[in-house]
Amino acid sequence: MAQYTNYILVCGGTGCRASQSEQIIENLRAAVEQYGLEDTQVIRTGCFGFCEKGPVVKMIPDNTFYVQVQPSDADEIVREHLVKGRKVERLLYMNPETRELVPDSKHIGFYKKQLRIALRNCGFINPENIDEYIARDGYVALGKALVEMTPEEVIKEIMDSGLRGRGGGGFPTGLKWQITRKVQAPQKYVVCNADEGDPGAFMDRSILEGDPHSI
């Protein structure tokens, strides 16, 4: 498996895709190849959440955050940031109050108070690559539930956690599983209800697009 020291994360959420993020990805990959940067990988991620500033490009490991990037900016980003070691200042986020440039996304007001739990992988991994999800401890809980626990223990764990549905009703998940467990039927189904019409569930799209394996 190839080893990389630099990663270029490009938002592949609906908003950024509508603003040519796919062309940005293509141009970035072409520039990386042109400059012979074998230690650099371009990754399409899920939504970063900061859609009003998209398309968004994030450089890892230094967390430089470029906003409103255009396909024509790709070569400059690779040449200046990776080859010459200089940030492309005109693409950095500007604090609207202080007018100061904020290179690191951790210091942007929109992000700095966030504690992501359900959305922890969105904007960080390639949603179509199961290996990247597993590398972030993906499916560990599922493995434990299937191998180390009984169905009753799993339901009790969910009940005790207080986990609720993400829709407006907030129905207790453990109770839902308990009711389903008691139903006598030769075959049962798991249905993913991703309702974007519910104002309280608009985040469903972000998870489905950006971290589908978590579903």
Sequence positions of predicted segments:
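Feature of Fe-S/electron-transfer and energy-metabolism proteins
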Residues: M1-I215
